């Protein structure tokens, strides 16, 4: 699921919040709401099966939540020598075994079973823009501000730099086994590539900077979207376009993306509070909701950091307002 780098892009998005608020979607209210960060969150990620979420809060470090029981499992602090939490990106591995959390300069990997940190790594030369974690924490994928993407095998230390991009990276993702990666950049291109060889598999061109990318965990689809009005679902086996999302807004930017387990639906979240459900086959928007905003912001707003399918009838979201919310699809 893609969502992790949105804090790095917020400045350019807030300009549009008040305009987008006028285009109100279905006014459905959440079935349930839980507070996971009292004064708001910097980042959040929900596991693909919607049983766990990791939240980076403004004053209380990093928390891992059991979403089935709304129970706090662990509270972590990446910056041991600082009272400020600076974690701006996070990812839960597809097998729910580990969590990666990242600031601009460093990242940590945590065990879900024990709550202990496996290690702490610093990133040199350029800031972290986005990060993804493979199953069993075998490898990590790091998108950087200088346009490079780095794949690191955490077991062997092997490091591969992908140098295909010309400008800063905005989003990265990889398959659960860590073998195939996707990266999107300000150079208007999304690349799908092999993490063993660095070989480009597919190149997806866009008319503006690519702000969001994602891979279906089952290896069926890729997703790429830009900063204006182009969002595509691609066949990961052939590289051919399956559909383009259909929307009427002049601009629609996404902060998170998730494919449904059966491969028929796409779930997106946006910096405008909007959560949307799409039919992959047609590109049509089926339904949309708005997450609860923070009331102390003007205009009252919230960024949807993560969204996931709980089952065929419900979805769950985490947002910058600090709330996890459960929504009914049908």
Feature annotation, model-predicted:
Residues 2-10, 16-330:
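WD40-repeat beta-propeller superdomains and closely related acidic/aromatic-rich repeat-like regions
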């Amino acid at each position: 699921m893609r969502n992790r780098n949105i804090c790095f892009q917020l400045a350019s998005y807030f300009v549009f919040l008040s305009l987008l608020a006028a285009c109100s979607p279905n006014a459905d209210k959440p079935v349930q709401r839980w507070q996971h960060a009292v004064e708001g969150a910097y980042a959040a990620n929900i596991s693909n099966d919607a049983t766990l979420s990791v939240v980076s809060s403004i004053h209380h470090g990093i928390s891992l939540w059991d979403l089935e029981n709304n129970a706090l499992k662990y509270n972590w602090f990446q910056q041991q020598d600082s009272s400020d939490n600076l974690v701006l990106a996070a990812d839960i591995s597809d097998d729910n075994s580990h969590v990666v959390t990242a600031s601009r300069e460093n990242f940590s990997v945590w065990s879900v079973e024990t709550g202990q940190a496996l290690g702490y790594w610093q990133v040199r030369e350029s800031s972290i823009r986005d990060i993804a974690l493979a199953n069993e924490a075998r490898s990590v994928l790091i998108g950087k501000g200088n346009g490079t993407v780095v794949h690191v095998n955490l077991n062997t230390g092997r490091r591969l730099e992908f140098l295909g991009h010309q400008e800063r990276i905005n989003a990265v993702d990889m398959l659960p086994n860590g073998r195939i990666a996707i990266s999107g950049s300000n150079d208007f291109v999304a690349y799908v590539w092999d993490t063993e060889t660095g070989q480009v598999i597919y190149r997806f061109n866009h008319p503006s900077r690519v702000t969001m990318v994602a891979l279906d965990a089952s290896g069926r689809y890729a997703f790429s979207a830009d900063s204006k009005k182009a969002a595509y679902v691609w066949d990961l086996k052939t590289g051919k376009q399956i559909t383009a999302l259909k929307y009427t807004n002049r601009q629609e930017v996404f902060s998170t993306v998730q494919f449904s387990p059966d491969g028929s639906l796409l779930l997106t979240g946006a910096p405008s509070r909007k959560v949307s459900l799409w039919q992959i086959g047609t590109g049509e928007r089926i339904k949309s909701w708005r997450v609860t905003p923070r009331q102390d912001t003007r205009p009252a707003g919230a960024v949807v950091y993560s969204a996931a399918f709980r089952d065929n009838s419900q979805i769950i979201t985490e947002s910058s307002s600090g709330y996890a919310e459960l929504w009914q699809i049908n």
